[in-house]
Every structure is written in C-alpha cells, then in structure tokens.
Amino acid sequence: GMLAKYLLNEEKPNDLKSMVRRYLPEYGDYEKQDKFDKIPWDKKELDPLCHYGCQDTDYTLRLMLFFEKKLIDLGLYNTYRNLIMTASRVLTSVEKNGLYVDRAFNQELLDSYLPKIEAAKEAIYNLPKVKKFTKLYNQSKIEKYIAKLEEEIENLDPRVDKRKIQSREQKIANIRAGVFTTKKELELIRPVSLGSSVDLPQLMYSEEGFNFEVIKKNDSGKPSTDEETLTNLRLTVKKPDSPKAVFLDSLLELRGLEKMYKTYIEGWHEKTQDDDRLHGRFLIHGTTSGRLSSAEPNAQQIPKTSVDPNIKKQLVAPKGTLYIASDFSQAELRIMAHLSGDETYLNAFNSGQDPHLAIAATKYHVPYEEALKIYEDENHPDHKIWKVRRKQAKQIAFGLIYGIGNKLLAVKLSDPKAGIIVTPEEAQKEMDIFFGQHPKLKTFLKKQEKFLRKNGYLVSLFGRKRRLPQIYSSDRGEEAYALRLALNFPCQSAASDMCLFGSILIYYLMRQGKLPPTKSVCLVHDANYQITKPENINTWSIYEMWQIYRNPLTKPYFGFQIDDVTMAMDFVIGRSMAEELPFIPGYDYRKMLEPDFSVEG
C-alpha cells in the first residue's frame, strides 16, 4: 500500500495511519490507536493487541484495493507491477545480503584517523592570524572572568565572607600570574573551538579575526559557518596563498576528515552487525524524483576511491568471492540526448567520443580529434586548458540535469586553488551559450514547460509522475524551482530506473539459472555491486549483463524502447569495493584470490 501511494503521490507521509486518515476517513477512530502505540510491546494486553493487528491488516487491504483502482485509472499499474513491486523484492534481497566489513581494517582506520584530525586542527591553530586572534580572544575572556570575580568581592561582606573574599583574590592573583587550575579557568586559555557555534563565528567574522563578509545566516540569525558558506566564501578570495584562502582551505579539509571519521569509520564500526555486515535500508520511496535512496549506510554518499580509497577498502568481498561492480556512465546525459534528439550528444555517444570534450571542442570551434590529442598529451602547453574546458562542459551539462541555478553552477565551475573563480553572472552566460549550441534541448525544455503549466506534473519514460504545484505559485523562486525540474526529473528518474530495471532483469535471470549465481549487496541509482565466486566471472556472463544494462527490454513492460542511443556500462572487479580493476576477457579470476596476487602483476 505504501509503495502504491508513493507512485500516486510521491510526497510524504507514507505511513499507514496517515494514509488511513487521508484516504479512509470513515475509519477515523483508528487515530485512537496512537495512545496504544506508546505502550511498550511487552506491556500491551493480548485482546487489544489482536484487535490492533486485525485493524492494521484490514486497513492495509482496503488501502491496497483503493490504490489499485487508482493506479489502473491513471495508467500507472504497469509501472507499479513491473518496476516498483519487482524492485521491492530485489531490494529486500540486497538488504538481507549486506555489505561485508573488514573489522580489522576498520579498527586500523579508527586508530589512524584521529591523529590526522588532530594534525589538521593543529595546522589551523598555528596559522599566524588564528594565533593572534586566540591570544586576544582568550585575553578578553580572562578580563571578563576577573571582572566577574571582582564584582563578587564587592558584593561580599568583609565581616562575614572573609574566606570567600580571600579565595577570589587568590584566584585573581593566580590568573594574572598565568596559573590556571580549575576546569573553568583552563577553559579561558584553550584554543579556539573550530566546531563551536560561538568561537568559530568570532574567528571568522569579527574585526580581530578574519573579518569575512556575512553572506548567510543560520536559523538563529547568527552568521553561518556551514560547508556551503565556507565554499562560497572561498570563491570570494582571489589569491590562493592568502591567509584567508589558506584558513578556509584548511577548515574545509578538517571538516572533510571529521565527516569521513564520524560517518564512514566510527559510524560503520557502530552499525556493523554480528555477522560482520552492514545491513542498510534501500528505499524505493525515499525521494520525490524516483531515484533510489538508502540509509544506514547511505550508499549513494560513500566517497569515491579517488577521494579516499581507505573508505571503500573497508567493504570487502567475503572469503572465496569477488566484487563485480557494474557502473552506468553518463546515463542522465544519454537520456537527455534521447528525449531532446540533440545531434551533438547523440553523435558523440554513438561514435564513442568523449561527450564532454566533444561539447567543449564544438564551443571553441576546434576539431574533436585535435582537442582529444591535446587533452591526452600531458606535455602539450594547452593540456591544462583543455582539462578545464572539458570539466566545465561536464559541470554545465550535469548542472542543468541536476536543476542547479547559476549560483551553484558558479561554485561547480570554480577551482579556487587553481585561481579559477567564476561569478554567478558568468555561470549564467555559460548556460545561455550551452543552450544556444543545443537548440533541440531548448525546444524539449519548452515542451516540458508547456506540459507542466497545463497539467501541474511531469511524466518520466517509465510512467512515474512528479507533481509540481509550485509551477502555479506567485513566488518566482518556487516557480523557478519547478521549471528547473522540467529537465532534471525526466533525465534523473529515467536513468535511475534504467539501472534499476536492468538489475531486476539480471536478478530474475540469475534465479532462473540463465545467469551465474551472484548476490547483489549494494544497489544505487547508477551502479550495482554484486559478489560471486571468481569462476562465475567470465566473458559470457559479463557480456550477458552488459547486453541487458545497455538497453533493457522495456517495450513489453512500459511501452517504450530507446533506439537512438544505448546506455554505457563499465564493469570492474575487485577483492574490495575500492579495488576497481577493469574486466579482462579470458582472464582467470581465481588468480585474484591467490596469496601472491598483486594488482601491478
């Protein structure tokens, strides 16, 4: 019932009681069960417990019958049956299989990361500006503390409170002599707390500190110190080696280390169960876009190997098995090319060109082969220029797909450490140039906007609907948000569902014995991580999976088939999630489990 309701209306809540209240109002007395819910299970009486269970079952069935009719009437039943329900079974299997954790290596990281964090803090404390501020800041705290003690002395009666007066006078003398003994006194001379909502804003925004401009405030009205603010402030600093730039770079690095430790090292240590596995939750109904989401852990946000290989290295294949990771490449762009009919992207994808480099070459009126030659030659004087051009073409394309505005695109296009700062106005100009180069994409967007304004929702290739009442809002910001999703939703949703449906087909073919046995342990919107015995990894099995993923047979189930571009899929093999060795046809993967195996060999 919950999944049916999600397909009918992707907005929350999706829990049973909320759905009964909304769709079965004649059973309003069900709300009285809220009090019963608060009683611990071992304290509930049997008779009301049986009645409660029967009500749950009855209302679940009534809701399902109600939703089923709605799904049929709205033409969503095929999507529900062939995608949502089958995906639910597959994801239940993924959750049960779990991600195997190398506990010994996890413990190594627990021991080694804290010194890294402390070293990063120490580097910030040793910055001249921070040292100077800390001295002034602590002196100010000391003076306030002494003033408080002196005020207390004045309010004491010398005839009655002689010992109290002497005690406070001694404290003042000790502090002025640089002797701090109590916990409260030691707080007066500690380093600035880089995680404090009091200390850090003072360091960043006061005249005694770095005196940054306040560009954002938090909910309590105080200057913000969140990651987005730090990143945007960094874009305002032109010189990469200036004190402000060094401070912001160092603080962002510290935040990254702390997040890695708390989420992926300490967090996984606490969540790993007795079977040495992380059994996360994979949710079909967790996003409004239709993309898969996950929690405990959030598989979508596991850092890439290039960021820190040690994080994925904790996730190993169980003894006697290997990872097969099947990873979609540029799926959203391929869907965008199909939906819009954009020849530049279609030609690049179908000819095997690098699409981002092809777009950059078109923009700068350089033949693709010449641009590719420069891009691949690290010794060419223009190599770095073309690296930046390709990266910016990629950021613009994905920025449009992800529905970001010119401010966030400016952040994406900038590289402060390399001295590249892009303003929102410049980012907007780049977006306009991009649309000028891709008129069919602009035409597709106008069609989407027209449909959205008429109907109040968008529809994906797989039949999902995204309801956007914001399109009718008098608030221009809300209307702009809905318009950005006119490209974002159909591309993101269909790309995720292509991966999901391909994974469903592989799961059922494997269960029917038509593919070698594998266990999917992690499924995200653009990748499927499976474990299997090495003898199951061969040219035939990989080719069969590749054929399914590149163009799953969608016509019989959803009424469409993409015929002008195929999906691109990379297969990598490894003993852990961090080891990403490209599949080699004909290789005997049993060798990877031999004690003397090395990647270099």
Give the label of every model feature segment.
Residues G1-G601:
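Conserved catalytic core of nucleotide polymerization and phosphodiester-bond processing enzymes
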